[in-house]
A protein has these predicted regions:
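Alpha-helical transmembrane segments and their immediate interhelical loop/hinge regions
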Residues: 211-260
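Hydrophobic residues within alpha-helical transmembrane segments
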Residues: 54, 58, 89, 127-134, ...
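Membrane-embedded helical hairpins/re-entrant loop segments and their flanking transmembrane helices
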Residues: 64-88, 255-272
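A short amphipathic helical element positioned immediately N-terminal to and/or at the very start
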Residues: 35-43, 111, 216-228
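Membrane-interface helix starts
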Residues: 11-15, 43-52, 225-239
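Transmembrane helix-loop-helix hairpins in multi-pass inner-membrane proteins
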Residues: 1-35, 39, 93-205, 285, ...
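Alpha-helical transmembrane segments of multi-pass membrane proteins
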Residues: 81-90, 267-278, 307-318
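Membrane-interface interhelical connector segments
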Residues: 188-228
């Protein structure tokens, strides 16, 4: 029954994702000359199309390699191919759910189904998620400290959203650190907040909320133990995460070169793409659709001048997000098809 409820939940979120996607496509392509758009896309050099595809696959697969690396660190032997599959599944469910909230639970579901113990799987996924948020927060802070003028010049009115996105990421990292290092304090504060809310007339089931919080804190307690016992592995994880994130920032520069453009330094394009990621990462919109395209159009207008802006956006988002989403969906369908097939085979055998 719980599984059916989860399927319905993800089904609704998928249809919401499709609705936002169609709206985004409509806004981006409105008023475009499609024959000119097609001819511009065709002119992109094949070697850079291939490089962009490689980077996009690398971005998702790198997370799978990190999961595999950490699982093996705790003595769980798992194939890299399986972990890359978990990563693509996570990418798909993160892409279709608000604030990317659906990815990690589904990754944990598939890992548990494959026989990976829940405590170890939870600790590994939380370590990967924490490293990701930490790296993004550090990158965002560095950009703000050293390239604020460039940011304000290119982001314009979207600079506000950059500050919001960066602030949310930094606050989340601080919260995660408190959760890992001071869980008793977090529980005490949460209990006080619930009591205050109840006094204000809000009907909050205190015991139920605290039970959920305890489960959340227990998960991070395992992550703390993992951090303490594998300090050198965590340093490697942070370096791997930085390389992974940088590959996503580099994608736009490859598209820039693919159209034969020049005049803008590589570091500027990387910084601007990183700024977009920081701004939209925490927004409660599936796949950060709409706001990502809007920011891309504003930020990269001086870079992809004239007829190249929309084609560049189509390639960057198409290859870096939508194509990877399709691959993730195919992996999920394959796994579920195998499960149904094995279930029928087992039923026939029992009969």
């Amino acid at each position: 029954m719980k599984r059916k409820s989860t399927d319905r939940k993800y089904g609704k979120e998928f249809f919401l994702f499709l609705a936002i996607m169609m709206l985004t496509f409509g806004v981006v392509l409105r008023g475009q000359n499609f024959s000119q758009l097609k001819s511009t896309l065709i002119r992109m050099k094949p070697v850079y199309v291939g490089a962009a595809l490689f980077l996009s696959v690398f971005f998702v697969a790198a997370e799978g390699c990190m999961i595999c690396f950490l699982l093996r660190s705790v003595g769980i032997i798992v194939h890299v191919r399986e972990c890359v599959g978990y990563s693509f599944a996570g990418f798909f469910f993160s892409g279709i759910t608000p604030s990317a909230s659906g990815g990690q639970p589904m990754q944990l579901y598939y890992m548990k189904r494959d026989g990976i113990p829940l405590p170890e799987g939870t600790a590994v996924l939380m370590a990967v998620a924490t490293a990701y948020k930490f790296v993004l927060a550090v990158v965002g802070m560095m950009i703000l400290l050293f390239w604020q003028k460039l940011l304000k010049e290119h982001l314009g009115g979207y600079f506000f959203w950059y500050i919001v996105g960066l602030s949310l990421n930094v606050l989340l990292v601080i919260l995660l650190l408190f959760v890992m290092l001071r869980p008793v304090l977090i529980r005490h504060l949460a209990e006080k907040i619930i009591v205050m809310a109840q006094k204000c007339g809000m009907k909050i089931p205190k015991e139920k909320w605290l039970e959920k919080l305890d489960g959340f804190l227990d998960g991070y307690r395992g992550t703390v133990l993992f951090f303490r016992e594998h300090k050198e592995k965590i340093l490697i994880l942070i370096v791997m995460t930085f390389v992974q994130r940088s590959s996503a920032f580099l994608l736009t520069f490859l598209v820039y070169l693919g159209f034969g453009l020049s005049g803008t330094a590589m570091y500027q394009i990387l910084l601007l793409q990183a700024a977009i990621y920081v701004a939209v990462d925490m927004l409660p919109v599936p796949g950060a659709q709409g706001i990502t395209e809007a920011m891309y159009g504003k930020v990269f207008l001086p870079v992809f001048s004239g007829q190249y802006l929309v084609p560049a956006m189509c390639v960057t988002r198409g290859v870096g997000f939508y194509l990877m989403l399709v691959i993730g969906a195919l992996w999920v369908l394959k796994i579920h098809y195998k499960k149904i097939g094995s279930g029928r085979k087992k039923a026939c055998t029992n009969a």
